[in-house]
UniProtKB/Swiss-Prot annotation:
Signal peptide: none
NCBIfam families: msrA
Xref: SUPFAM superfamilies: Peptide methionine sulfoxide reductase
Catalytic activity entry: L-methionyl-[protein] + [thioredoxin]-disulfide + H2O = L-methionyl-(S)-S-oxide-[protein] + [thioredoxin]-dithiol; [thioredoxin]-disulfide + L-methionine + H2O = L-methionine (S)-S-oxide + [thioredoxin]-dithiol
A Pfam family it matches: PMSR
This enzyme's EC code(s): 1.8.4.11
GO molecular function, one term: L-methionine:thioredoxin-disulfide S-oxidoreductase activity
Record's keyword terms, sorted: Oxidoreductase
Protein's UniProt name: Peptide methionine sulfoxide reductase MsrA
Role played: Has an important function as a repair enzyme for proteins that have been inactivated by oxidation. Catalyzes the reversible oxidation-reduction of methionine sulfoxide in proteins to methionine.
Lineage, opening ranks: Bacteria, Bacillati, Actinomycetota, Actinomycetes, Micrococcales
HAMAP family linked to this entry: MsrA (MF_01401)
InterPro entries hit by this protein: Met_Sox_Rdtase_MsrA_dom, Met_Sox_Rdtase_MsrA_sf
Naturally occurring in which organism (per UniProt): Paenarthrobacter aurescens (strain TC1)
């Protein structure tokens, strides 16, 4: 099993897709990359803690290759916008990848190179060593499954799920 910590805007979006990905055993929404110990959602959303909203995706690389997890990441958000994903604006929504080993860092850099071929603007995804990971509050875990009819889910997450189904259907469970 392997775990990647990835930030691509609001963690609810990545969580929704990776929850439906074959070989993924766990998706934990959380915060990392900031300077406040044990931040909460409201502190992170204030933009003053330095944290990014992220998901820790644990998967079996014999079922779903690392490259698929990473390529999906770049397909599900715009890695060319600094500190913004759609209407979500602030450093907490930055495109980011947090590694724990040199091998992960290399994988992340290779994924950025692959993704750059798909984007006309430069990719601004931050690649950093993983500092402390703070698990988000329970309400944010598997958010889409809990609140599929909530406005944000309908307007923002549903199109991302549709895109994932279009391009990664072989890797999705439903």
């Amino acid at each position: 099993m392997k775990t990647f910590v990835l930030g691509g805007g609001c963690f609810w979006c990545l969580d929704a897709v990776y929850q439906k990905t074959r070989g993924v055993s766990s998706v934990v929404s959380g915060y990392t990359g900031g300077h406040v110990r044990n931040p909460d959602y409201y502190e992170v959303c204030s933009g003053t803690t330095g944290h990014a909203e992220v998901v820790a995706v644990t998967f079996d690389e014999t079922v779903v290759p690392e490259e698929v997890i990473l390529d999906m990441f770049f397909a599900l958000h715009d890695p060319t916008t600094l500190n913004r994903q759609g209407y979500d604006v602030g450093t907490q929504y930055r495109s980011s990848m947090f590694y724990t080993t040199t091998e992960e860092k290399v994988l992340f850099e290779e994924a950025i190179e692959r993704a750059q071929a798909l984007w006309s603007d430069p990719i601004v995804t931050e690649v950093s060593r993983l500092p402390e990971f703070h698990e988000a509050e329970e309400v944010h875990q598997n958010y889409y499954a809990k609140f599929p009819y909530q406005g944000y889910c309908q307007v923002i997450i549903n199109p991302k799920l549709a895109k994932a189904r279009k391009y990664y259907s072989a890797w999705l469970t439903a």
